Swiss-Prot record:
GO molecular function: ribosome binding; rRNA binding
Protein name: Dual-action ribosomal maturation protein DarP
Classification via CDD domains: YjgA-like
Native source species: Nitrosomonas europaea (strain ATCC 19718 / CIP 103999 / KCTC 2705 / NBRC 14298)
Keywords recorded for this protein, A-Z: Cytoplasm, Ribosome biogenesis, RNA-binding, rRNA-binding
Region of interest called Disordered, as start-end residue ranges on this chain: 1-25
Amino acid sequence: MTVSDHPQTVSQPDPESESRPSKTRLKQEMHALQALGERLVELEPARIAELDLPEKLAEALLEARKITSHGARRRHLQFIGKLMRAVDPLPVQEKLDAWQHTGMRHTAWLHQLERWRDRLISDETAVTEFVQTYPHTDVRQLRTLLRNIEKEKLAGKPPHNFRALFQLLRQIIPEIPG
């Protein structure tokens, strides 16, 4: 008997199977919810309260912080993932991303302050550029701090004026609001 003797059977797609997601997709979604739950566990209790989560989920998140055993923590995170199914993850994810973005913006501002401080100390022409960029600067106070920093370095004293310069820059250079 040859292959051509048998009619080819083409399986008809099951209409029910097309409407429901695959097991793989469901597992991926569950892992994503569990990962989101892990991020929530790392938050401070005040931040968790800001999210308006169901009480049972909020309690589970706070309890997870206390669990030290690896296996118990893993099971508890799976439980949190299960509880997360009842919550719309999009607003929670957006809030977490906004908090993270705010922290990154603040860090960038602090780095900008540090770069200005280092330039002002190492380059005498940076003072003129700084005053042009930030015209409301008290130039006399700035130059006094820079002179005192040099004196502290030569005397081997603690960097009091170094810190004072940073505080002055914090007052002068505005942090970009989010």
